[in-house]
Every structure is written in structure tokens, then in C-alpha cells.
């Protein structure tokens, strides 16, 4: 009887732990969906959609834009990028999350406007903080010297 009770308690503990883990990963899925939507909007060059994905008080930190603040300013920066690289595309390689943070590794490809014979390829990693389905912080890292 003691063995049956021990097995029952073990199974109960496992079920409770598994339920808690599943509930915690639901936030990860929602956060990852928000970031996936940002990449889909980027590849469509849809700056209006990008503006809606970022929270109104969002911040973006990157080598070229160390302190962008607000979803409108962030979207305007993407509009400028789409103008400078008309065929810009983000090729997502890795997407992972932990709580409200999403980690993305991707490669930006395209050609600078007027230089169709010179392709660019930039490896990038971004750390996004997502709250209530919106990106509130974007810390992006890349080598500015890569052609």
C-alpha cells in the first residue's frame, strides 16, 4: 500500500509540474508569435504592420540606431531601410524564447539601392521583450562593417 501511495504522489506531482510548465510556455508562444509577425511584416515591407507590433512606448537599440523610442519612430526607421534596400529580406534562422524574451538569429539580405550587382548579407541577433502581444524593447546586434 505504501508503494502504491508513493507512486500515486509521484504521478500527481508530475502532472502538476507538467501543467505548470505548459501554462508558462503559453506566454512564450504568444511572445514568439508577435516576433514572427514582425518578421512577416518586414519581409512584406509593411512598416504600418511593424508599427502596430511595437508598443507605443517601445525602444530599439542597435549599432546604427542606439536609442529609438516609440513605435512611430521605429516604423519610420524601417521605412527608410526599405527605401535604402528595396529587396530587403530577413531570413530567420533561429527563434527561441524564455518568459517574455524572444531571441532571434537571422540574416538580412538584399541590395543597396542603385547597387544591384553588390548583394549584402548581414548576420543579426535580436533580443525582444514582449508584453501583451507587443514588442516593448528590441536590442539588436550586428557588425556594421559587413558589406
Positions of the model-derived regions?
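Acidic-and-aromatic substrate-binding clefts and catalytic sites of carbohydrate-active enzymes
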Residues: 67-68
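Bacterial N-terminal signal peptides
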Residues: 7-17
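Acidic/histidine-rich, surface-exposed loop or edge segments in extracytoplasmic proteins
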Residues: 53, 57-63
Amino acid at each position: 500500500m505504501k508503494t502504491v501511495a508513493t507512486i500515486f504522489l509521484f504521478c500527481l506531482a508530475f502532472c502538476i509540474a507538467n501543467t505548470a510548465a505548459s501554462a508558462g510556455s503559453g506566454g512564450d508562444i504568444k511572445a514568439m508569435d508577435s516576433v514572427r509577425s514582425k518578421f512577416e511584416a518586414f519581409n512584406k515591407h509593411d512598416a504600418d504592420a511593424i508599427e502596430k507590433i511595437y508598443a507605443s512606448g517601445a525602444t530599439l537599440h542597435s549599432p546604427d540606431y542606439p536609442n529609438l523610442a516609440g513605435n512611430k519612430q521605429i516604423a519610420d526607421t524601417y521605412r527608410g531601410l526599405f527605401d535604402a534596400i528595396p529587396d530587403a529580406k530577413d531570413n530567420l534562422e533561429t527563434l527561441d524564447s524564455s518568459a517574455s524574451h524572444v531571441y532571434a538569429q537571422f540574416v538580412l539580405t538584399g541590395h543597396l539601392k542603385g547597387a544591384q550587382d553588390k548583394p549584402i548579407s548581414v548576420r543579426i541577433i535580436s533580443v525582444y521583450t514582449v508584453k501583451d502581444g507587443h514588442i516593448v524593447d528590441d536590442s539588436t546586434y550586428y557588425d556594421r562593417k559587413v558589406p
